[in-house]
From Swiss-Prot:
Stored SUPFAM superfamilies: PP2C-like (SSF81606)
Name recorded for this polypeptide: Probable protein phosphatase 2C 40
EC number: 3.1.3.16
Enzyme class: hydrolase
Entry keywords, A to Z: Hydrolase, Magnesium, Manganese, Metal-binding, Protein phosphatase
Entry cofactors: Mg(2+); Mn(2+)
Source species, domain of life: Eukaryota
Cofactor annotation remark: Binds 2 magnesium or manganese ions per subunit.
Length: 493
């Protein structure tokens, strides 16, 4: 990407990924003794994506990193993870591991995962939040996704949003996450520096469990570890369910640890009780696309139907009061509360029905930390906001073209069908272009027209005031298949 002035704003962050057209994985005889990739699952497969394009546009001011947890997150961890210009290799001793905020519940999770089947976990009991150097238990192989030979990371902040992408082409997987923060970016920052590592840790535990377990399913005996070099277990239903459970456990753990941190620091920062974040995670492992979401960010698949026409398939659920299913769930869970939805928001405060954080709508003690009109009256039966995610796994087929992963700001202006139509049209005529940046350009043009501005007038409106015309918008486009093309990704702030 050329440096210089951009008509849609100043481009401060630019990253993108282009897959090589080669076999993914390395031969077993080339792996040193004791070397494990993808937690022991030695994948010999071709990547099911060809490139990644991403972009983010700020409507809110992009503030300094959070100062929670004694400032360690904002001053040490996030700077080591953010890569504003390109994907870069994960350092051998990532600063990410300096945050041992998850240690107590990680040890509990290790015990429960080793002794239980693949069932949805309950949130772990809150433990004390503390910071120290992190070291995984010796019984779990250190490294996993972080130690794969070609793991690369990119990400950054735009307004209250955070975007994160981690890729290992050699193992054929891609992790993408959008944390759409609200009432501040503390929760989004917390997720950016903890959730990926927590997912990695739980996947290590899954590997350990599968190595110790023998399963008899439909009469077929699977020796899960005695012959692992000859079997790709990432394609088994047992593994798929295990991955979904890992994502679920990691999210519950993040919620527990974040709210514990809020309780510890709310005396000095009472605003933390209202801070929250939507969560959208996609994990592409070989041909399987795992999706987890809380809130109203979306993953939308563009796929060809039987008539060879491109159609949009939403892989996520919209967790808002506008969703009749969600509203009905809320009402059924709080039968004794006649005033749940006020003015189209939960207790008149929040439109999303599921999110991480936002403790004042979950615990009476946290609501009491707020003063005056900020405090929610008649908090009769909390929690009113759920942390139970929607999850699914989609098997990538030859009919699947690309996936749009985006915060709700995109869908304030475009329907799912309009978004995939714009991307398809752009990529068809600009095979080496940047579809995510193009979507943002179209969004800004539409926002300007809607407000009665010229494009230049809108882009000259400073962040903060620009929030009147569009939200923070984060977009990633994952191009599926093995077509070779050049991609870029941009963050506008």
């Amino acid at each position: 990407m050329q440096e210089g002035t951009d008509p849609y704003g100043e481009i401060e962050i630019s990253f993108g990924y282009q897959c090589n057209n080669k076999k993914i994985g390395i031969p077993e005889d080339k792996i040193a003794d004791g070397r494990e990739v993808l937690g022991g699952f030695r994948l010999q497969k071709t990547s099911s994506f060809s490139c990644l394009s991403g972009a983010a546009l700020s409507g809110n001011p992009t503030l300094a990193n959070t100062n929670i947890c004694n400032g360690v997150i904002g001053s040490e961890i996030l700077p080591s993870l953010d890569s504003p210009k390109s994907f870069r290799k994960v350092p051998s001793s990532p600063a990410l591991s300096k945050l041992d905020i998850l240690s107590p519940s990680l040890h509990g999770s290790m015990v429960s995962l080793s002794c239980s089947s693949s069932t949805s976990p309950s949130p772990p009991e809150p433990e004390s939040c503390y910071l120290t150097s992190m070291s995984s238990p010796s019984s779990v192989n250190e490294g996993f996704l972080l130690s794969a030979m070609e793991v690369q990371v990119a990400g950054g902040a735009a307004g209250e949003d955070r975007v994160q992408a981690v890729c290992s082409e050699e193992n054929g997987w891609l992790f993408c996450a959008i944390y759409d923060g609200f009432n501040g970016r503390d929760a989004a920052d917390f997720l950016a520096c903890t959730l990926y590592e927590s997912i990695v840790f739980h996947l290590q535990l899954l590997d350990r469990q599968m190595k110790q377990t023998k399963s008899d399913d439909d009469g077929e005996k699977l020796e899960l570890l005695s012959n692992i070099s000859n079997v790709d277990y990432s394609s088994t239903d047992l593994f798929r369910q295990g991955v979904l459970d890992c994502l679920n456990r990691a999210l519950f753990q993040a919620e527990t640890d974040f709210l514990r941190m809020v309780e510890q620091e709310m005396e000095e920062r009472p605003d933390l009780v209202s801070v929250g974040s939507c969560v959208l995670v996609t994990l592409l492992v070989g041909k399987d696309l795992y999706v987890l979401n809380l809130g109203d960010s979306r993953a939308v698949l563009a796929t060809y139907n039987g008539n060879k026409k491109l159609q949009a398939v939403q892989l996520t659920e919209d967790h808002t009061v506008d969703n009749e299913v969600e509203e009905a769930r809320l009402l059924s869970e709080h039968l004794d509360d006649p005033k749940i939805v006020i003015g189209g928001k939960i207790k008149g405060k929040l439109k999303v029905t599921r999110a991480l954080g936002v403790g004042y709508l979950k615990k009476e003690k946290l609501n009491d930390a707020l003063m005056g009109i900020l405090r929610v009256r008649n908090l009769l039966s909390p929690p009113y906001v759920s942390v139970e995610p929607s999850m699914r796994v989609h098997k990538i087929t030859e009919s699947d073209h690309f996936v749009i992963v985006a915060s709700d700001g995109l869908f304030d202006f475009f329907s799912n069908e309009e978004a995939i139509g714009l991307v398809h049209s752009f990529v068809s005529s600009n095979p080496s272009g940047d579809p995510a940046k193009f979507l943002l350009e179209r969004l800004v043009a539409k926002a300007a027209a809607r407000a009665g501005f010229t494009l230049e007038e809108l882009t000259n409106v400073p962040a903060g005031r620009r929030r009147r015309y569009h939200d923070d918008v984060t977009i990633m486009v994952i191009t599926l298949g093995t077509d070779q093309r050049t991609s870029k990704a941009s963050t506008f702030v």
